[in-house]
Amino acid sequence: MPELPEVETTRRGIAPYLEGQRVSRVIVRERRLRWPIPEDLDVRLSGQRIECVERRAKYLLIKAEAGSLIGHLGMSGSLRLVECGLVAAKHEHVDIELESGLALRYTDPRRFGALLWCEDPLRHELLARLGPEPLGGLFDGERLFQLSRGRSMAVKPFIMDNAVVVGVGNIYATEALFAAGIDPRREAGSISRARYLRLAEEIKRILAHAIERGGTTLRDFVGGDGQPGYFQQELFAYGRAGEFCKVCGTTLREVKLGQRASVYCPRCQR
């Protein structure tokens, strides 16, 4: 599933080609995504100038003059730029054609993504209750420490809770906990302030570095320019169960937490 770095990589890839451009038409070949694409999307978006492309959590916000398109890549979705009129392949469900001659093409083999229209995206039910951005000033270790008091849930699902902080998905939660030396099974409320301060810094560092590397390509993800991400070459724990720890040589173990596979080093993480 594309996580925050993959979505931010997509945003950075498509924004220069969309911002300031006017939409000529919208072609929808398949409306049945996680939520149906609005039947009047072509009417609402055609003729409008795109003002900016932003990101909130794992959502892309394409802001036009009279509203915004909320995009989510789901499990296997991607957005890339193609020339208008390029024949669509299977699973290429939507083209947003621009007067520049380029089109933003949405591809989603599993159809778990979304393209929704609204006037004010930050008040939309999908975004209104989200926590702070992990790379912003409102997120730090003190927030993690205070919100964790009295919590018996494991620390990994705790930091993946979008009400606590957005955008820390399975890949980057696994990597941040490894870097901070924290066992993902530990009760959130049992972890000290000092360790949460370290964990928050590792979350920020790893997410920022993953964005620089273009995200993590594990299955279907490519950026807005069609290129894969390269952070998977630097993974220490995620997807490496049964392999040797790159730090101490111990065999990495896997455990299920909140229905997610969690890989950890029993020696490095306590």
From Swiss-Prot:
InterPro entries: DNA_glyclase/AP_lyase_DNA-bd (IPR015886), DNA_glyclase_Znf_dom_DNA_BS (IPR015887), Formamido-pyr_DNA_Glyclase (IPR020629), FPG_cat (IPR012319), MutM-like_N-ter (IPR035937), Ribosomal_uS13-like_H2TH (IPR010979), Znf_DNA_glyclase/AP_lyase (IPR000214), Znf_FPG/IleRS (IPR010663). Coiled coil: none annotated. The gene is mutM. This is Formamidopyrimidine-DNA glycosylase. It comes from Ectopseudomonas mendocina (strain ymp). CDD domains: EcFpg-like_N. The active site is at P2, E3, K58, R260. Disulfide bonds: none annotated. DNA binds at H91, R110, R151. GO terms for biological process: base-excision repair.
